[in-house]
Amino acid sequence: MSLQTLSTPTAEPVEEPRPVEAPWQVSDRIGTALLRAPQLGDAAEIWRIAKDSRVLDTNSSYAYLLWCRDFPGTTVVAEVDGRAVGFVIGYLRPESPDTVFVWQVAVSPTERGRGTGTALIQKLLDRVAPHGVTALETTISPDNPASIAMFAAVARRRGAQLTKQPLFDAGVFPDEHAPEDLYRIAPIAQEIR
């Protein structure tokens, strides 16, 4: 058996949306937390924070490793004393690259109530807005008022509109799961101080 070289036809290059540049070194502090891009070493702690939240669907530890490696431009980690204590992970929607979808946001119990979750989302939006992103989307189940309040606070601080519509009914999930509503914040211009 011999290997065959495959040739590809010559075609005009397709202009694709530019991905958000990954390793951004600009860090901010909120209280004692440093907000920064993720590192592979953060994945295990991010997985634990998600698992301990008891609200998020916990993905495999492998998924968080990939997230830290492949999506550093749309992920922000909160660090205190060298340890991850919170995170927001998201991605640019392929069908709508001007929209960042927030997949998960969580903060360890020791950091809750300090505005860390809101600061993580604000940092993410500040990071992606210069790249043409104008909207944020996320899904939240109706039984999670803390998340709803957090995203409402982000919208207020940005002077943006927060809209809600049903997205996934409980019946579409293969397991027992609450329905998920789609929340959208737009426009996500710079934070109003």
UniProtKB/Swiss-Prot annotation:
This is L-2,4-diaminobutyric acid acetyltransferase. Residues 1-22 are annotated as: Disordered. One of its GO terms (molecular function) is diaminobutyrate acetyltransferase activity. PANTHER family: L-2,4-DIAMINOBUTYRIC ACID ACETYLTRANSFERASE, N-ACETYLTRANSFERASE. The gene is ectA. Pathway: Amine and polyamine biosynthesis; ectoine biosynthesis; L-ectoine from L-aspartate 4-semialdehyde: step 2/3. The lineage of its organism: Bacteria, Bacillati, Actinomycetota, Actinomycetes, Mycobacteriales. Keywords: Acyltransferase, Transferase. GO terms for biological process: ectoine biosynthetic process. It comes from the Bacteria. Residues 33-185 form the N-acetyltransferase domain. It is an enzyme of class 2 (transferase). Pfam families: Acetyltransf_1. InterPro entries: Acyl_CoA_acyltransferase (IPR016181), Ectoine_EctA (IPR012772), GNAT_dom (IPR000182). Belongs to the acetyltransferase family. EctA subfamily. Its EC number is 2.3.1.178. The keyword Lipoprotein does not apply. SUPFAM superfamilies: Acyl-CoA N-acyltransferases (Nat).
